[in-house]
Amino acid sequence: MRIALGIEYFGADYYGWQRQREVNSVQQELETALSRVANHPVEIQCAGRTDAGVNATGQVIHFDTTANRQMSAWTLGINAQLPDDIAVRWAHVVDDNFHARFSATARRYRYIIYNEPLRPGILAKGVSHYYHPLNADQMNEAGQLLLGERDFTSFRAAQCQSNTPFRNIMSLSVHRAGSYVILDIQANAFLHHMVRNIMGSLLLVGTGEKPKEWIGEILDAKDRTVSGATAKAEGLYLVDVTYPLHYGLPKPPLGPLWFNA
């Protein structure tokens, strides 16, 4: 039997998603918890591997099991075995041809900035702090230059292992909600550090250091060295993964659950 789970986690204390020796990873914690409940070794596949410090409210995984358990075992039971900063949001039996990564048609991220002169306290690790005043409207207009299927070489990490730099950004918006500036971006898939590199460049537009047309120039250059610095991991959330409707997966609120602007 193949089961899909919706996963939420706070990435501050993990060295990213992927299982690694001698360091904490989200994958390791989930596989350990699932193996206990299933009473056999479980390996999981995810929709998108997040970097160290990156969070998720809409991660999706799948695993195969021979265990006959009530569905509550895969939600309440797993949550009882997990640390407080990782949680299962839903569970759903899926066809054997479902794959958390390869069946996905889109991923959506939100990047949340606390834009005030002084740093926050309560949400210090849940948002990115940027003290220079930001013009969200200018950032939003600049971001529209990135829409569509394009070569995003200028926004990929040097260590990116993707075979192609082409990605299709379906939607991108930047707006202000009080003290917060929020980037909301959806694409068929993302290159390594792509969202953080886009945000790092949009910040320079937001401060007025660069004109909004500069974003298009970066894209055309196909050169990572001409774009802005990589934005911090704090404040980045994988909030949604889209699948064909016939899989019938639940669609909870996007999150972060404390911030649904």
Curated annotation (Swiss-Prot):
One Pfam family here: PseudoU_synth_1
What residues bind substrate, as annotated?
109
| A single GO BP | tRNA pseudouridine synthesis
In its keyword annotation, does this UniProt entry include Isomerase? Answer: yes
The molecular function terms of the Gene Ontology recorded here are: RNA binding; tRNA pseudouridine(38-40) synthase activity
Give the E.C. number(s): 5.4.99.12
For whether the record's keyword set contains tRNA processing, the answer is yes
Which chemical reaction does it catalyze? uridine(38/39/40) in tRNA = pseudouridine(38/39/40) in tRNA
Keywords on record: Isomerase, tRNA processing
Q: Which residues form the active site?
A: 51
In terms of NCBIfam families, this protein maps to: hisT_truA
Query: HAMAP family, alphabetically?
Result: TruA
Q: Function of this protein?
A: Formation of pseudouridine at positions 38, 39 and 40 in the anticodon stem and loop of transfer RNAs.
Family according to the record: Belongs to the tRNA pseudouridine synthase TruA family.
Please describe the quaternary structure of this protein: Homodimer.
Instruction: Indicate what this protein is called per its UniProt record.
Output: tRNA pseudouridine synthase A
Give the gene that encodes this protein. Answer: truA
